[in-house]
Swiss-Prot record:
Name of the protein in its database record: ATP-dependent Clp protease ATP-binding subunit ClpX
One GO MF term: ATP hydrolysis activity
The protein's role, per its UniProt record: ATP-dependent specificity component of the Clp protease. It directs the protease to specific substrates. Can perform chaperone functions in the absence of ClpP.
UniProt cross-references to Pfam families, sorted A to Z: AAA_2, ClpB_D2-small, zf-C4_ClpX
Similarity field: Belongs to the ClpX chaperone family.
Domain ClpX-type ZB positions: 1-53
Length: 415
């Protein structure tokens, strides 16, 4: 207990022993600790193993070539995005590893990333795969759930809490992690002019994100939710957290095209050029002013200096996603059915049909698994009850007629 105005003997909040000639007590903010407990805490911290990243020297950080090679094992296509992200991640962690070095007193600023691409193009997968290669904590946040402080919804600090939780409570490790903020385009302000009214889920959220993206010491409620007076807070330094923001930015290509073309209205050749180039405009010509016109505030654009546009996945890309990556969807289901002694076979036309369905549904790679799950439902229900070796063949007819009740997904024959 703490001494108030009287002469009460102080007690250590950790061991409970009283202050005497040999045991000295230090107090502050409602707690106290003795010199013996301080020594024990120091020993614990000395013996505690630092994270892999904390031990990683500049020479041990994977090079951009190594990072891209790792991405190639799990992500199909998006070659430009892989190269840009590999360089950005390498430079970021090289900066983190070298912060203790005084390089001509030059302060290297953080280069966060903005990914622009349609739904299902691989934005989240790219960020997650890189975090796995770097062996750092990773958290995903949905920008549409965030609101300005004081309004119903999530505070931006809750993003940091997710990262700390994914680091098993290790704040120091979380401070070297990666955060992916999805749907960043959905919090664009209503116009490029400064708002005179509250926009708590748009411009207000962008303003709230500024500090943590740039780098600050944020106070995070350990249990989540809103901050309360006298509440204990986690102090998280975001200076070394890499932020990757992503969004579809529907309509941005039109803004870019209008600026690039000298004659956007009428029947001139420039209009045809815009239609033919499509997403190529996003790769080559998008500038910060285009993003401002879309609705991002200039300050947040300045804190996302690395911008890259992802391609819409083609039918061939989607087909390759089904079979080529190390954790491809078809490989996963083959392993799953093998546990029930079932040999799973997809013919080439079936793979094409599944890819076409994903294109028709405009879900990209994200929709592939749900399509295959629906195809496999009856087979997964029946297979465990069937004894002996079995084979399941998925043909184009199965894919295109899977909604018909008369279609049987399991085709049996003697092995």
């Amino acid at each position: 207990m703490l001494r108030s105005k009287g002469d009460l003997v102080l007690g250590c909040s950790f061991c409970g022993k009283k202050e005497d000639e040999r045991r000295r007590i230090v107090t502050g903010h409602g707690v106290s600790i003795c010199n013996y407990c301080v020594e024990r805490c120091a020993e614990y911290l000395r013996d505690r193993k630092p994270s892999a990243l904390a031990l990683m020297t500049k020479e041990e950080i994977p090079t951009p070539l190594e990072l891209k090679a790792y991405l190639d094992q799990y992500v199909i296509g998006q070659d430009l995005a892989k190269r840009v992200l590999s360089v950005a991640v390498y430079n970021h962690y090289k900066r983190v590893a070298g912060r203790s070095l005084d390089i001509d007193s030059v302060l290297i600023e953080k280069s966060n990333v903005l990914l622009i691409g349609p739904t299902g193009s691989g934005k989240t997968l790219l960020a997650k795969t890189l975090s796995q290669k770097m062996k750092v904590p990773f958290a995903i946040a949905d920008a549409t759930t965030l609101t300005e402080a004081g309004y119903v919804g999530e505070d931006v600090e809750n993003i940091l809490l997710k990262l700390v939780q994914n680091a098993n409570g290790d704040v120091a490790l979380a401070e070297r992690g990666i955060i992916f903020i999805d749907e960043i385009d959905k919090i664009s302000r209503k116009s490029e002019n400064v708002s005179i009214t509250r926009d708590v889920s748009g411009e207000g959220v962008q303003q709230a994100l500024l500090k943590i993206i740039e780098g600050t010491i944020a106070s995070v409620p350990p249990q989540g939710g809103r901050k309360h007076p006298n509440q204990d807070m986690l102090r998280v330094d975001t200076s070394n957290i890499l932020f990757i923001c992503g969004g579809a930015f529907v309509g941005l290509d039109g803004i870019v095209g209008t600026r690039v073309c000298k004659n956007p209205v009428g029947f001139g050749a420039d209009v045809k050029t815009v239609k033919e180039r499509g997403l190529q405009l996003m790769h080559e010509d998008v500038i910060p002013d285009d993003l401002v016109k879309f609705g991002l505030i200039p300050e947040i654009i300045g804190r996302l200096p690395v911008t890259v546009a992802l391609d819409a996945l083609s039918k061939e890309d989607l087909r390759n996603i089904l079979v080529r990556p190390r954790n491809a969807i078809v490989r996963q289901f083959e392993a799953l059915f093998a546990l029930d002694d079932v040999r799973l076979v997809f013919d080439e036309d079936a793979l094409d049909a599944i890819a076409q369905q994903a294109i028709d549904q405009k879900t990209g790679a994200r929709g592939l698994r749900s399509i295959v799950e629906r195809l496999m439902l009856d087979a997964m229900f029946e297979a465990p009850s069937l004894k002996g070796k079995k084979e399941l063949c998925i043909t184009k007819k199965v894919v295109t007629q899977e909604e018909k009740a008369s279609v049987r997904l399991v085709s049996e024959r003697t092995a």
